[in-house]
Swiss-Prot record:
The keyword Transmembrane applies. CDD domains: 7tmB1_calcitonin_R. It comes from Xenopus tropicalis. This is Calcitonin gene-related peptide type 1 receptor. The chain crosses the membrane at residues 150-174, 186-208, 220-248, 263-283, 300-324, 340-361, 377-397. One of its GO terms (molecular function) is calcitonin receptor activity. May function as G protein-coupled receptor for calcitonin-gene-related peptides and adrenomedullin. Specificity may be modulated by accessory proteins. May activate cAMP-dependent pathway. Residues 1-28 form the signal peptide. The gene is calcrl.
Amino acid sequence: MGLLLRSALFKYIIIVLIMLNLRGYVLAEQEQGSQIPLEEIIQVGVTRNKIMTAQYECYQKIMQEPANGKEGHFCNRTWDGWLCWGDVSAGVISEQRCPDYFQDFDPSEKVTKECGKNGHWFRHPDSNRTWTNYTRCNTFTHEKVKTALNLYYLTIIGHGLSIASLLISLGIFFYFKNLSCQRITLHKNLFFSFVCNSIITIISLSAVANNQALVATNPVSCKISQFIHLYLMGCNYFWMLCEGIYLHTLIVVAVFAEKQHLMWYYLLGWGFPLIPACIHAVARSLYYNDNCWISSETHLLYIIHGPICAALLVNLFFLLNIVRVLITKLKVTHQAESNLYMKAVRATLILVPLLGIEFVLFPWKPEGRIAEEIYDYVMHILMHYQGLLVATIFCFFNGEVQAVLKRHWNQYKIQFGSSFAHSEGLRSASYTVSSISEIQGTTYTHDYSEQSNGKNCHDMENVFFKTEKQYM
């Protein structure tokens, strides 16, 4: 009973001291309030709150942990003003991560505290007071700020290029009606998910990275934007999975699917990613409710990354099985259609490892300043240039798209040439019109058959319905 009373009294004393300390800070702020900007006051308040919370938790830990039962000299557990230190054997240098109280402190660096051989904490010779070595916390701050700024601009440029290339690709798909088919519809949804993700990423980075006061106040809107970002990131990968499932159904089980129902793809691509995003939001608010949910130092991110990795693995399995079937068909029948499908599969097969490698590298962040910097640059390129990569492979390198663009470009050149010839008066109007009509018809037929072997998007989807099951 006496022990409980003493513990409660000690807690009360700690709380009173903290409150008195806080009152002194508030009075000092009121005296100088007219001179200090609001953003700095908010930041200082957040820093003090973190320190006082850590101080209270440290005193709780000091009281509740059992006494050190080891033999020999040791340094007693203590609070040094910023960090909590446990019992340390004599002659040992204890270390832990730097705190994140201040903007110029790097939490990835280490703080050290030396326990002397006599069982007393090291005292600094200048002040003769116990001393903790925090010097490494801001030794490389300037270099890391430069790196962070470079990564910020790299990210913004990557998403800007992604948005531009994806919008151009969507314009091509919507403008040229002869490209319309179910596979292109899946491409459109995939591209749109990447556009939305890039837009929300740029908005979030512009608002958060340049506004520490916003992060300090921790508004709900900040967390909502992070929730939307994680949801859209999931949509990117599940629409990639839809691409793989569609091709697998079309090529491997085409006998059972004359026309696929896209509603299931919409549910998988737009609906399913809501589940892990909502679970992550609830778990984050309960177990790791950091400001704006921007920290990556939590295993709760695997709630998002786990389903994405599963989608990538399933997609890879489907694509490898498709390649097996196509190779079998090529060996037996030497069909030209199999070559066309192989080109379509090859694009997806290239993208899946490129989009998934970031999740392979994510848990393996190396130690060391230079290695970490290289890792950060590689990860940012892999993560933030995905939209540009998707648009390039699925649209700009697409043979059908290139054939359509070339055909329309040739038509434009012919029409422009006819207008120029007409203005010069080189031919009569009737002769010019009839000649151009003949040339246009000839150009259209020759160019398209040469590029696509006489097959369009719908032909490619339907050709495998006619193949024999023995090659499956």
